[in-house]
A protein has these predicted regions:
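Short, small/acidic-rich helices and loops at N termini and domain boundaries
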Residues: 1-86, 260, 360-369, 373-376
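Glycine-biased, small-residue-rich flexible motifs in mid-sequence functional cores and linkers
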Residues: 2-6, 82-377
Length: 377
């Protein structure tokens, strides 16, 4: 069964167990001389290693049939890359704890080809209308060089993937569970979205081997891969305990760019993003901020354009129309306090609507923080 296996094959066996990180596999190799010797060693020879892990490893090894697992992957068109492979995405390879193996469907080469334009877009699973609109406007303002990475969960993740596809951008999804036969471990409602990502030339990737259980502890591991694949991470909306905060933390630990969208101080879904901004994270209120933060020159076709006034209500609803009318009465320039008083709207609604209007190029702010109405309106 183990005849004619290369050192790469034995690396695959160890990585497939999901018991050892890349650093630990390296230590095992150094201790035994080769991974083949480690695999064939008796349990007594493993005394230098943690007993509970050794017990799990020998239980795994007893039931592991390499040819069966490789055939399963091949039959279901599930590909894999090892950390020691040349094609392994370099952005991911350069984080503190890169996964020793990744399983994927689709075109994983995008992760390398578009690494300088790779952007993680993450946020709350229970996204607000504000969060969804902001994600939509921001992604619509990016050109086709960008690769959008997210986690295929509900809320902002779903919005990020859909808007990328709608705007002709490639997108990749990172799962918190395994790839299985015709089943993708994501919300059932996103099954066809996952298929669409692959059909449109994107990819779905995970570090969890087939048949493994989906556990709560999987998701922080997934979040580190989302951040690790990308040059920058944008948090659109996040509550106090949102996993998106952890993704931002992983990105910062990897010396990647971290950005956040300002939100209402009254919104539970903006506690995380507003805290990130307090911690000197770059604020994003329009696509041009993403280009600036990532050091990418904006394509002429994506420079902010003023939207037709007929679309204002569609973009920002009745509140948007009220704010525009207020600014017209105030000679197209006003403080936020003046707008609130004039519109008879509460503060959170004014702030959230202004952000949408800014993203749409309908209003802007000057150095004093005053709101300016577009000259074309």
């Amino acid at each position: 069964m183990l005849k004619n296996n290369s050192e790469r094959d034995f690396y695959f066996f160890f990585a497939y167990s999901d018991l050892f990180g890349a650093e630990k596999i390296s230590l095992i190799k150094n201790f035994f001389g080769t991974l083949e010797k480690a695999w064939l060693a008796e349990k007594i020879e493993w005394q230098e290693f943690k007993n509970s892990t050794v017990e799990k490893f020998f239980k795994f090894k007893k039931n592991f049939l390499p040819e069966r697992e490789k055939n399963y992957l091949q039959e279901n068109k599930i590909n894999y890359l090892l950390l020691i492979d040349e094609d392994y995405p370099s952005n991911l390879k350069n984080i503190s704890y890169p996964p020793p193996i990744i399983f994927y469907l689709g075109n994983i080469k995008l992760a390398e080809e578009q690494k300088e334009y790779s952007l993680a877009v993450v946020g709350s699973r229970i996204a607000s209308a504000y969060g969804r609109q902001v994600a939509k406007e921001l992604i619509a303002g990016l050109d086709k060089r960008f690769l959008i990475i997210s986690g295929l969960a509900f809320g902002i993740d779903t919005c990020a993937h859909r808007e990328a596809l709608a705007n002709g951008l490639k997108t990749g999804a990172v799962l918190g569970g395994p790839l299985e036969k015709d089943i993708i471990s994501c919300p059932a409602e996103n099954y066809w979205l996952a298929k669409k990502i692959i059909a449109d030339g994107g990819f779905i990737v995970t570090e969890f081997p087939p048949h493994s259980l989906i556990q709560k502890s999987n998701f922080p591991r997934r979040n580190r891969i989302i951040a690790g694949l990308c040059l920058g991470t944008l948090v659109v909306e996040a509550g106090r305990k949102s996993g998106a905060n952890k993704t931002a933390e992983y990105a910062r630990d990897a010396n990647r760019v971290v950005m956040a969208v300002p939100g209402s101080i009254y919104s539970e879904l903006s506690i995380g993003t507003n805290k990130l901004l307090k911690d000197h994270t770059d604020a994003v209120s329009g696509p041009e901020d993403i280009y600036r933060c990532l050091g990418i020159k904006m394509a002429n076709s994506k420079k902010p354009k003023i939207k037709n006034t007929e679309n204002i209500e569609k973009i920002a609803g009745e509140d948007g129309l009220k704010i525009i009318k207020s600014l017209l009465l105030l000679n197209k320039i006003a403080n936020i306090e003046e707008i609130i008083e004039n519109c008879q709207l509460d503060t959170p609604r004014v702030h959230s609507t202004l952000t949408i209007l800014e993203l749409s190029g309908i209003v802007s702010r000057n150095g004093s923080g005053q709101i300016l109405l577009s000259k074309n309106l």
